[in-house]
Amino acid sequence: MGAAASRRRALRSEAMSSVAAKVRAARAFGEYLSQSHPENRNGADHLLADAYSGHDGSPEMQPAPQNKRRLSLVSNGRYEGSISDEAVSGKPAIEGPQPHVYTISREPALLPGSEAEAIELAVVKGRRQRERHPHHHSQPLRASPGSSREDISRPCQSWAGSRQGSKECPGCAQLVPGPSSRAFGLEQPPLPEAPGRHKKLERMYSVDGVSDDVPIRTWFPKENLFSFQTATTTMQAISVFRGYAERKRRKRENDSASVIQRNFRKHLRMVGSRRVKAQTFAERRERSFSRSWSDPTPMKADTSHDSRDSSDLQSSHCTLDEACEDLDWDTEKGLEAMACNTEGFLPPKVMLISSKVPKAEYIPTIIRRDDPSIIPILYDHEHATFEDILEEIEKKLNIYHKGAKIWKMLIFCQGGPGHLYLLKNKVATFAKVEKEEDMIHFWKRLSRLMSKVNPEPNVIHIMGCYILGNPNGEKLFQNLRTLMTPYKVTFESPLELSAQGKQMIETYFDFRLYRLWKSRQHSKLLDFDDVL
């Protein structure tokens, strides 16, 4: 759109410059002819009309139909000068050059239909025909014998009644109102050339006469000039597009930056975990030579005490602790043995069920009904703590049999390979059971609730997830066994479809009801109460 407008502007500017050049050349040559040959006083007008008519044939000067431009050029100054010369000399009007009026028009109303875009050159003959026809609009005028005898029968009254009227054709304005003597002013002295009229003759472009519904414009097309409204609209569109492009570019940059930051954080997590496994914080600090200025100066350990004395104190303290533990162990073992010697005693089996398991509320209803030693404990995954779980286990054991301890235990919770999801924000992994104090305390207290009189190692089964699907699962079990020493505890997490898994399920559940519960565990179509 911009390229087409600029191309049109270039064509119009070239056309106007060529018109101006031709007009100047014709006027200069006409002046030369009028000076060298006085009988051709109107030579400039001939050449000026020829320049316009010759130029109008060029395709780039054909205006758009809606412009309806008209260029009127009247040689009234030279016409009046020739008439005054004839009046003073007293010679007949037929002798000497005949006055002419040249009119170049683009008005469609003044031209034939087939030549709506052509230029009409009207040659009005001299005084004799005007005296013969005083009202020249009553009969059409004929061209001079030397001309092409073109019919110029359109009345000058219609020219004078056009939109521009006598402003552009003052010669016609003189011819319209009265007879020939008053129209040509033969008795009057020669009128001096009006400066405004001469100026209009010298101009190469005049005011346009256009239709009433279109505002009057000059020879310069309005769209070639600077239009503030169009420019403002274009600037607004450009600014809107620039803002849209800027927002898209900023969004792309933010997305790429977030991806880079996310990948870098992931890289730091991976590298940091390996570094923690490789060396402790103290070792890293000792080996680090680039300390911050705010770090305290590392001080050597106080060696004033003899190392031999400190080692003796540590060994004696350990000996006292072991003696106390042995005494407690023997006391607790005797009490448990006394409780188990009663008739009909069955070693308790504790089921610890997390509420996070789907349809966990139905699990207590599918346990083995022929085994009263199974103690189901359903805890709240979201709000319970390790202390709450331990207190509930102790309370249920005392209710079952005072002084009884756990022989077998089932932990039914969510998790995955290498980790147990015991509580909200409490995930048991092989690293966390070594570092987090509350988790270490939980497993140590749980070990004290395990049986001491069981000739076989106590068993803790894990259901709801497959811990051993990852090598970290075996590390987790190993760390838990280390935490629960001196009690003999083993951890098992077999697949439910295996033989060991079937044996584990039959230890705690009615196998038929368990399969039914498992098939309806993730279903919302049928309520499990109806099945039971």
Swiss-Prot record:
**Which of UniProt's keywords are assigned here?**
Cell membrane, Cell projection, Cytoplasm, Cytoskeleton, Lipoprotein, Membrane, Myristate, Nucleus, Phosphoprotein, Synapse, Synaptosome
- What are its GO biological-process terms? cellular response to amino acid stimulus; cellular response to electrical stimulus; cellular response to gonadotropin stimulus; positive regulation of neuron migration; regulation of dendrite morphogenesis; regulation of neuron apoptotic process; regulation of neuronal synaptic plasticity
Q: Which Gene3D superfamilies match?
A: iswi atpase
> Where is region (Necessary and sufficient to elicit dendritic processes and synaptic contacts) located?
2-235
Q: How is it modified after translation?
A: Proteolytically processed after NMDA receptor activation. Cleaved in a calcium-dependent and calpain-sensitive manner. Calpain cleavage is essential for the translocation process from dendrites to the nucleus.
Q: Where is the composition biased (Basic residues)?
A: 127-139
Describe its membrane topology. Answer: Peripheral membrane protein
Where is this protein localized, as stated in its record? Nucleus; Nucleus envelope; Nucleus membrane; Nucleus matrix
Motif Nuclear localization signal per record, residues:
249-252
* Region (Disordered) residue spans: 34-67, 127-174, 275-315
Query: Its domain of life?
Result: Eukaryota
Family, per the entry?
A: Belongs to the NSMF family.
User: What binding partners and quaternary form does the record give?
Assistant: Interacts with KPNA1; the interaction occurs in a calcium-independent manner after synaptic NMDA receptor stimulation and is required for nuclear import of NSMF but is competed by CABP1. Interacts (via the central NLS-containing motif region) with CABP1 (via EF-hands 1 and 2); the interaction occurs in a calcium-dependent manner after synaptic NMDA receptor stimulation and prevents the nuclear import of NSMF. Cannot be competed by calmodulin.
What does the further note read? Transport from dendrites to the nucleus is induced by NMDA receptor activation and results in a rapid stripping of synaptic contacts and a reduction of dendritic complexity. KIF5C associates to its 3'-UTR mRNA in granules along dendritic shafts, suggesting that this protein may regulate its dendritic trafficking and local translation at postsynaptic sites.
- What's the protein called, per UniProt? NMDA receptor synaptonuclear signaling and neuronal migration factor
